[in-house]
């Protein structure tokens, strides 16, 4: 990602962070947790979990982990503190349904490059995590890895808190 791309992503985060009701939906595998070869060893990045804890505590902000895995397994791998109760778990095909359920006015959708998320609505923000995958034809903004996702989530949390 070039410096200009990063500036553009940060401006997009500034815009969407002000939406009245935000849904942050992140793929677990490849979005929050790096692919280490063995899916049972996958753990969410610590900084991502911390940022999600902050977002979970904010009013009018819904956080969802998107995964085909069993919700109990994902919960164990997330490294979340007491805020686990507010975390939503949905399959990739159910993000739109959750958006409607919580009446979100904006969505940040973080997806791994090997996933093809459903198209977003105007004003939503797509972030694709390459994880050494190809960047050709991927939707939205592109970040290199799960550590970059952690930075994005920290920025969203900071902006939503107003600090």
Question: What is each PLM-predicted segment?
Answer:
Residues 39-41, 72, 135:
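Flexible, glycine-rich phosphate/dinucleotide-binding loops
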Residues 28, 66-69, 131:
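Glycine-rich beta-strand-to-loop/alpha-helix junction loops that act as flexible
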Residues 91-163:
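C-terminal cap/substrate-recognition subdomain and adjoining C-terminal extension
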Residues 15-63:
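Active-site neighborhood of HAD-like aspartate-dependent phosphohydrolases
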Residues 43-105, 112-115:
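Active-site phosphate-binding/coordination module
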Residues 36, 74-77, 120:
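A short acidic (Asp/Glu
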Residues 8-9, 48, 94, 149:
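Amphipathic coiled-coil/heptad-repeat helices and related helical stalk/stem segments
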Residues 1-28, 32-36, 79, 157-163:
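Non-catalytic pre-domain segments flanking phosphatase-related domains
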